[in-house]
UniProtKB/Swiss-Prot annotation:
This is Crossover junction endodeoxyribonuclease RuvC. It comes from Streptomyces avermitilis (strain ATCC 31267 / DSM 46492 / JCM 5070 / NBRC 14893 / NCIMB 12804 / NRRL 8165 / MA-4680). It is an enzyme of class 3 (hydrolase). The keyword Glycoprotein does not apply. GO terms for molecular function: crossover junction DNA endonuclease activity; DNA binding; magnesium ion binding.
Amino acid sequence: MRVLGVDPGLTRCGVGVVEGVAGRPLTMRGVGVVRTPADAELGLRLVAIEQGIEQWLDEYRPECVAVERVFSQHNVRTVMGTAQASAVAMLCAARRGIPVALHTPSEVKAAVTGSGRADKAQVGAMVTRLLRLDAPPKPADAADALALAICHIWRAPAQNRLQQAVALHASKGRTA
């Protein structure tokens, strides 16, 4: 499975592509950041993020896009920008018929480090180790995007089995 991880942000939108299957060594195919100037008009920033993500989709042809689920932050302005960048990533994938998976920051941290309360340095160190890299990807947004892709590759098989079981249960006329 090839997954594009997206760590949404208006100024720095981390992107990373990981390929592999659960239980096997994973391979990083690409990592980077789509940047926009903080002083640019919002609409232009969103268009720049769209163009950047479209380039990644064209180049790497992922089977799925994993996006960090936006959660409540103390700074409303920050959460709005994150949500807007997240929506752009989801729109780009949906337009192409690529499935989108949302993962919370604590889900990603737990999947990659074993602790949902891990800090950025711990996530970066584990991404480096899991992907057999020489150094942690910089900035942290890039490492977070790879962590999202890793999380999805590892969690997708269990999520798919659960969805199939629920569908089978529903098809037999049972309710939850």
